[in-house]
């Protein structure tokens, strides 16, 4: 049994809605959502936005394109799945990747249906999902389920306030915890109890902060929150470190620096997430 107790998070994609690479997003990143989490020798991935392609490239170069991991989806809006067909390890039939989604109950398609009949299906995409199915299993679960992945890894799930549904995650390992709370919209006048439960006493929380409070009224009902709400959750839940996430495509590096400065003046343990950054938990 390994003595490795590493617990770390890497941001492979921090942007929301649509990838926006270019000279104005070099610092905070232009790829859409993808998290890589290491718990000892185990690897967990959350979401498959465009950032997952770079993760796959690393696995291909360093691990002979073999992957044994659990991949959890917060939901299946395009910015959270669009990188999946470009994730190289899935095309290795020796890989063992367990895909999980908890937001599709009662909807027309299950996870495999979305991937096989909508995402990886001509004329939208020329490579059929059959080419990844040998490496993958597909698990639709009811949001609220608790996963015991073994090796001391517990993953708790909770419903988020987002169109078509979404699930947040709390990863617990070696006495520490990480909360992933995106995509979600706050409730005006009260804090979201589901989010508070996921974030309770977390060592690290990642929270949907697409907008500022000033911008939010124009986007009410779109399923996203603000950095000001992130700080309220962090304070109420006694979160140790908070990363603002799902950066709006219109927020270039200059604007993100302004937000970072405003946030730091209020809470020194909170700041915007940066693509490529690794965080020890």
Predicted stretch roles:
Residues 177, 185-275:
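Cap/insert and terminal regions of metallo-dependent hydrolase folds
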Residues 1-179, 190, 195, 256-281:
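Binuclear metal-dependent hydrolase catalytic cores
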Residues 182:
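Cofactor-binding loops of NAD(P)H-dependent oxidoreductases
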């Amino acid at each position: 049994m390994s003595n490795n107790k590493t617990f770390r998070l890497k941001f492979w994609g921090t942007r929301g809605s649509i990838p926006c690479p270019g000279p104005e997003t070099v610092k905070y990143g232009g790829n859409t959502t993808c998290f890589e989490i290491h718990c000892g020798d185990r690897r967990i991935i959350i979401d498959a936005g465009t950032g997952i392609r770079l993760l796959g490239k690393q696995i291909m170069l360093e691990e002979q394109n073999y992957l044994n991991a659990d991949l959890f989806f917060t939901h299946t809006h395009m910015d959270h799945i669009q990188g999946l067909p470009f994730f190289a390890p899935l095309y290795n039939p020796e890989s063992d990747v367990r895909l999980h989604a908890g937001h599709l109950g009662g909807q027309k398609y299950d996870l495999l249906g979305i991937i096989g009949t909508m995402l990886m299906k001509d004329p939208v995409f020329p490579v059929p999902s059959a080419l990844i199915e040998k490496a993958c299993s597909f698990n639709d679960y009811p949001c609220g389920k608790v996963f015991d992945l073994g090796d001391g890894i517990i993953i708790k799930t909770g419903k988020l306030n987002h169109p078509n549904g979404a699930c947040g995650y709390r990863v617990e390992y070696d006495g520490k915890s990480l909360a992933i709370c995106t995509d979600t919209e706050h409730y005006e006048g009260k804090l979201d109890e589901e989010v508070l439960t996921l974030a309770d006493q977390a060592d690290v929380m990642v929270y949907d902060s697409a907008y500022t409070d000033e911008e939010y009224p124009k986007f009410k009902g779109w399923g996203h929150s603000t950095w000001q709400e992130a700080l309220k959750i962090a304070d109420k839940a006694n979160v140790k470190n908070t990363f603002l996430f799902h950066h709006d495509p219109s927020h270039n590096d200059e604007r993100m620096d302004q937000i970072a400065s405003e946030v730091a003046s209020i809470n020194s343990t909170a700041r915007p997430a940066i693509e490529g950054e690794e965080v020890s938990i």
